[in-house]
Amino acid sequence: MGAGQSNEHGASSPEELSSVLAERFAAKCFTPLELTHFKDNFFSRALEQGGLRYWNEKVLSDFLGIPDGICTSSPKQPLDAGPVIFRMVSYLGAFPFQNTLAPSVLTFEAMVKVVVLLTERYGKALKRGDKDRIKLLFGSLADVGRKIPAESNKESTTEDSETLVGHSHAPGFSVDEPANDEYDEDEDDDLALAALESLDAIEVFKHDHRVDKTVYETRISIDTFRRLLMLLLVIAPLKPLESLKAYTTGLDARRMESVKKEADSIIAAFTPEESDGGISYKAFARTISLSLPYLFDPLTALFEHMLFSKNLNLSQRSYKGPATETEQEESENEENENKGPPSPPPASLTLPGSFESAILNPTLTSHLSFFLPSTSSDINILRSSVKLHPVFSTAAHGSSLTYFSHHVLTWQSATLLILQGSLADSASEEVITLGAYIPQPWKTSTSTSSLSSKTSDLLPCLFQLSPKHLFLPGNPSSSAKKPNTPTAYFSSNTGIAIGCQIPAPSRTHQTYPTPHGAGSLIIDSNIETAEFHAAPVGHDGVFLPAANASLEDPPTKLKLDLYTLEIWGIVPDPEASFSADPNLSPVEIQRAKWEFEAREAERRRNINIKAGAGDSAAESARWLLETAGIIGDDARYVGGRG
């Protein structure tokens, strides 16, 4: 049965079906008000040629506010992501027929599909719509130059001739040409199948959009990916209605050097093969899905801008016909001249407190947002109301575990441990940044209070940010939750241990935590050195191996001389607080604990004096400090009870 007979819309060609799909997306994925704003944004800026209304790269970049400067030669415009975004949009606009229609002209229908895909709104229209856009995003970034037929002395077969005829009207991207490889991953494009199923056009899909295997053979060039990553790092905190210029203007050379270094650290996680000149699909898919799940979130907020028009904001303007390129430039210049005062600086992720971070900066917090979730839902930490409260810093409080205990154990919420150092016994001064996300409050080893139901599903993670991004996820298996393998362990004698096995105490000698599972971090009792362990195997510990780990890889052991260690308390969303008292924030709870400990210590000291014990002043002072929990050898755990 032909596709035309089975299609209720009477459309049989990819172009017609693509248009019908865009209409369905527009009707089901946007509210009437959003669609009105969308149309105004598009048609008020659209160019026209031969009756076709469209956007070019300049219009797209100008509207979104994406800089088009060359980072190496134009200090005033250090970002150059405009061509990369335009390439991605031209590919996504052809969905679900990238094989024959990409690169697409950016008509209104194409832009509708782009916005639906990048803002993940397609679940409203596609029953089988998988929210994993990884294959589409890879195809939009891969080096996909036009397919050039190879010269051959042999005559083409009938099948080859029919294939060429079927594709002659739109050569498309080579990434979508079929090929014979042996990639063993599920080859079905669920999102494309769902789109065609929704139009009752599966036969057209089978005829024209054969299973794409060449995507597994193409690669993303390092330069292309770096330019995109630099933009994502700069605009990661962007909210849907915020101006991009608040993030992309005023970037000095020092900030851009920091952005480039962070981008290179992320690129290193994809293990790009220099000989092949880029990032493979397999490395891209595994690393994004398991190690950087929120990497493309900034594009969601960026393309939400299409759904709000300043022209319709509390005023009506007469309709203008399609603009020429000259008129478009004049209009943009007029808007720039009449723009209001500059936007206020973006809100900081960190709260004011007892110290300012020597490690966290806007670029590094953007990197954290690519994999750290919010405490309340599956969104990244920058897209929520979560804030970081300064709890402990060696730069501010010194390298004493006494102060560490006093500040950290009284914090009743999740914490972020982050440290910087360099390799011990090495001439290299390269800075290495490590960290751990600990979702439960730190507790004493004798604590019997169970974790709340809201925090029990949150998993810890251990990570390296530089010089190479490495992410070790928490182990969800209940078998990994044992009393002797807590997530975090604290002792004034042995120091701090993350993801280690704790030996039984001995009366004859001092025992020390040992590395266990796929990852662990050990910090000595003077907070001067740290050991980071990562292995490609080990599913019985707190942390699992990294996404791109290979069984052939040797275990990694880094011994660092520490520069700085910081603990940041995570202040949850107000409506989803983990506090026992919903009326108190974690900051207020910590303050109350300090006040209670001080009163309790003073009370017990007075009782001790009245009873006649502790004749010496030194003994009395020690009693006061021990009662307050400031000194002593109590081991401290977090997450050790499962």
Curated annotation (Swiss-Prot):
Transcription recorded as keyword: no
Cell compartments where the protein resides: Cytoplasm
Entries under PROSITE patterns matching the protein: TLDC
Keywords of the record: Cytoplasm
Span of domain TLDc: 358-571
Keyword tRNA-binding attributed: no
Gene Ontology cellular-component annotations: cytoplasm
Domain of life: Eukaryota
Biased composition (Acidic residues): 326-335
Region (Disordered): 149-171, 319-352
Annotated family: Belongs to the RTC5 family.
Functional summary from the UniProt entry: May be involved in a process influencing telomere capping.
Name of the protein in its database record: Restriction of telomere capping protein 5
UniProt source species: Penicillium rubens (strain ATCC 28089 / DSM 1075 / NRRL 1951 / Wisconsin 54-1255)
